[in-house]
Amino acid sequence: MSNYEAVSARSSEAVLATNKLIRNTYTLLSMTLLFSALAAALSMFMQVGPIAYYLSFGGAFLLIWLVLPRTANSAAGLGVVFAITGLLGFALGPILNMYLALSNGSQLIGMAMGGTGVIFLTLSGYALTTRKNFSFMGGFLATGVIVALIAMFANIFLAIPALSLAVSAAVIMLMSGFILYNTSSMLHQPHGNYLLMTVNLYLNIFNLFIHLLNLLTALSGRD
């Protein structure tokens, strides 16, 4: 086999691997979003309280940090991904019920869902179409997350509405950046793990929705 044929074969393999990774990731992402929505609906119907919220949220992140990295390359990893997204969906129920108690709550939730969908599809589509490598954003995004977490923790004690609004705006920008970054990773890491890719994109969407909902509520003048 000539050098040209060898390079061509490797290029074809990379393209096939990339297409498979993208297909598997978006298929699983769609399934987990649906599963998460069902879990949220169940949580809303059950009218679960704060304890269930914190347990679900905490359980999901324990799975993300301690279990998923060890199971991502096994069949068990798929179950872990659904457990994570199901728990986060269940934790979302009390939040949605809180917003639904507002006179325009259903409208705000609908706008947040629509806005989240538009942002995700636009940015992800842009990254896939242009095939740009956004890996250079990694350091900036990681730093931004640390700053946002510190600000959120501080605001638990300070309870400053303007700071909450600023944090939500910052998180929306950060999650938008992460969508570009994570989508780009699928293109430039053809042998990446689709389970990890799915969880990354799911978390981007989840956080984007939560903070967009908070921002829209603040701008609507509702407490």
Residue ranges and their predicted role:
Residues 1-223:
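A hydrophobic alpha-helical transmembrane-helix feature that marks the membrane cores
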